[in-house]
């Protein structure tokens, strides 16, 4: 079974994929117009229907829209509207429900008074309620309650609250017996400029941190937030900073693996369990002090490190003073061999062998997981370089507008995405139960095909593009390269999307035993025949197995749902 034949047939027409890919391009990618943020160098980003990425300006606009809506509907000031929305976590519908159900209760809860508690005269002299000094009325201010305090005391009170953190957003009157709210209008009037900025920052952040539909991007240094349609199924989010993460668990994006598996895998990578496995597999405890010792030389004579300094035989762990010619020499131990034949060391050796096998298995999956991660990071750097430097250079050399070269950016975006998916398939494979051997074999087959296809795309985008970047002028075969790369991008994208769906469904639609039998037989025979396919399909009238990838499809379909080859 040739990998090329499995990923796409020898008669595949790349131009068909290129045409369809260009037709779909406007639906999948859009230009990012971010003139307000010069640090955002992305040319394209994927358009997702279940979330939107928000800058600080976007958040402020959403806040203003919500405040205006509440102010209009409830006929209250914008300042009071902001206090209400903050109290109800920026949920407009909840504000409406609570307000119209019991306005008096809501006012009492948030500190919105209908009339002052005390009269505040506009002229004359008054005593400050904090420092008890006497001031002219124009040197004192009060919240809606009317309790007067001098400007200096207000400033100290507000500054202390702001320096204490976001709790300043629920600031109340300094009078201990009063619960009147102190809104942003008072902050802007009385606080120093630096405190105003800090308060505004807390206010903007509250829209994200108190809103269950909005989260900050977890990437270090990123100031974007994401507004998500909860319940949309796919939790993967791509921020404008190029970081992809899972909305549900806030780890990096990890489809097709679920959040629980990711949690276990990340914990396993950082836990001491694999250290213990390595110790069990590669060391033995000193018979005296029990410290683990790794044997790094050929002699069986082991001396423990100070202060223990116990000398013992590596094979039987007996004292070295009891060894010599009578035990078979210094490089053998007939005492150990005899004990092993009697079964004394069976359990210890079995435990060590199990630890070694477990470690080797984990290492196999982890190394490939980490390799794809590093490949993805390199692809991200190549993508950025392509966007900032190479596209403009290629446009000049090939005399084509940059808009006609976006197929290259799309190829690199697909490579980055596929590297991420492929990375997490190794975590998926690690947790496939041992008893599901057929499913494991079929999974490894699909994974191998995915790797093969991705390598072809990566090779084309990375290596085959170089001659066109180094050319002195327009290349006659550049359009052929465009067709090939666009075709590879489309085919790879389709395969990986189908792979993700299949793995997320737990390969539930796949007849594992049939997949294993067909894969094994095709490998042994060096190919596949239509006769074997008809036999397999005749055993189940409601499904048919694909000759290329062995996926079992419903009888009603004529194209394989996994690899998209015809029936």
Swiss-Prot record:
Keywords: Metal-binding, Repeat, Transferase, Ubl conjugation pathway, Zinc, Zinc-finger. Residues 124-337 are annotated as: TRIAD supradomain. A zinc finger (RanBP2-type) spans 540-567. Ubiquitous. SMART domains: IBR, ZnF_RBZ. Transmembrane segments: none annotated. Pathway: Protein modification; protein ubiquitination. Zn(2+) 6 binds at residues 313, 316, 323, 333. Gene3D superfamilies: 1.20.120.1750, Zinc/RING finger domain, C3HC4 (zinc finger), Zn-finger domain of Sec23/24. It catalyses: [E2 ubiquitin-conjugating enzyme]-S-ubiquitinyl-L-cysteine + [acceptor protein]-L-lysine = [E2 ubiquitin-conjugating enzyme]-L-cysteine + [acceptor protein]-N(6)-ubiquitinyl-L-lysine. Zn(2+) 1 binds at residues 128, 131, 150, 153. Residues 18-27 have a biased composition (Acidic residues). A zinc finger (RING-type) spans 128-178, 286-316. Residues 521-542 have a biased composition (Low complexity). It holds the Pfam family IBR. Its EC number is 2.3.2.31. Zn(2+) 2 binds at residues 145, 147, 173, 178. Its cofactor is Zn(2+). Zn(2+) 4 binds at residues 246, 249, 254, 259. One of its GO terms (biological process) is protein ubiquitination. PANTHER family: RBR FAMILY RING FINGER AND IBR DOMAIN-CONTAINING. Belongs to the RBR family. Ariadne subfamily. Might act as an E3 ubiquitin-protein ligase, or as part of E3 complex, which accepts ubiquitin from specific E2 ubiquitin-conjugating enzymes and then transfers it to substrates. This is Probable E3 ubiquitin-protein ligase ARI8. It comes from Arabidopsis thaliana.
């Amino acid at each position: 079974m040739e990998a090329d034949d499995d990923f796409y047939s020898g008669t595949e027409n790349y131009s068909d994929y290129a045409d369809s890919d260009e037709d779909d391009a406007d639906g999948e990618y859009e230009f990012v117009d971010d003139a307000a943020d010069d640090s955002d160098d992305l040319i394209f980003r994927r358009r997702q229907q279940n979330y939107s990425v928000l800058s600080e300006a976007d958040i402020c606009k959403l806040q203003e829209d919500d405040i205006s809506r509440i102010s209009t509907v409830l006929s209250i000031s914008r300042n009071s509207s902001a206090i209400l929305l903050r109290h109800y976590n920026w949920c407009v519908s909840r504000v409406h429900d609570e307000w119209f159900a019991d306005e008096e209760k809501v006012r009492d809860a948030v500190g919105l008074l209908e009339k002052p508690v005390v009269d505040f005269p506009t002229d004359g002299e008054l005593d400050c309620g904090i420092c008890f000094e006497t001031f002219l009325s124009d040197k004192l201010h009060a919240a809606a309650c009317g309790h007067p305090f001098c400007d200096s005391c207000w400033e100290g009170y507000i500054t202390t609250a702001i320096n204490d953190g976001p709790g300043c957003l629920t600031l109340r009157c300094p009078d201990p017996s009063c619960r009147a709210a102190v809104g942003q209008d008072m902050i802007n009037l009385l606080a120093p400029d630096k405190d105003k900025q800090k308060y505004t920052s807390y206010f903007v952040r509250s829209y994200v941190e108190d809103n269950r539909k909005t989260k900050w991007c977890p990437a270090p240094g990123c100031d974007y937030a994401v507004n998500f349609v909860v319940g949309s199924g796919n939790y993967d989010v791509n921020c404008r900073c190029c970081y992809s993460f899972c909305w549900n668990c806030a780890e990096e994006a990890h489809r097709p693996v679920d959040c629980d598996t990711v949690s276990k895998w990340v914990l396993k990578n950082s836990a001491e369990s694999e250290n213990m496995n390595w110790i069990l597999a590669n060391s033995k405890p000193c018979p005296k002090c029990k410290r683990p010792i790794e044997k790094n030389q050929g002699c069986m004579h082991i001396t423990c490190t100070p202060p223990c300094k116990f000398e013992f035989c590596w094979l039987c762990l007996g004292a070295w003073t009891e060894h010599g010619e009578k035990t078979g020499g210094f490089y053998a131990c007939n005492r150990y061999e005899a004990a092993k034949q009697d079964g004394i060391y069976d359990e210890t050796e079995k435990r060590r062998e199990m630890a070694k096998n477990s470690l080797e298995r984990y290492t196999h999956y982890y190394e490939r997981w980490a390799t794809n991660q590093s490949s993805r990071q390199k692809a991200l750097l190549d993508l950025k370089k392509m966007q900032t430097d190479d596209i403009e250079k290629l446009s000049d050399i090939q005399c084509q507008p940059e808009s006609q070269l976006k197929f290259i950016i799309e190829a690199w975006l697909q490579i980055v995405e596929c590297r991420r998916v492929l990375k997490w398939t190794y975590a998926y494979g690690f947790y496939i139960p041992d008893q599901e051997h057929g499913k494991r074999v079929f999974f490894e087959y699909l994974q191998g095909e995915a790797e093969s296809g991705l390598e072809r795309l990566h090779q084309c985008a990375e290596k085959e593009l170089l001659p066109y970047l180094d050319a002195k002028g327009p290349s006659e075969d550049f359009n052929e390269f465009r067709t090939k790369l666009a075709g590879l991008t489309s085919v790879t994208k389709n395969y990986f999307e189908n792979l993700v769906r299949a793995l997320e469904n737990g390969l539930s639609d796949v007849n594992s035993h049939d997949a294993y039998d067909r894969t094994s037989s095709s490998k042994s025979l060096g190919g596949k025949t239509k006769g074997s396919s008809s036999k397999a399909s005749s055993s189940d009238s409601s499904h048919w197995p694909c000759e290329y990838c062995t996926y079992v499809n419903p009888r009603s379909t004529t194209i394989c749902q996994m690899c998209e080859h015809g029936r």
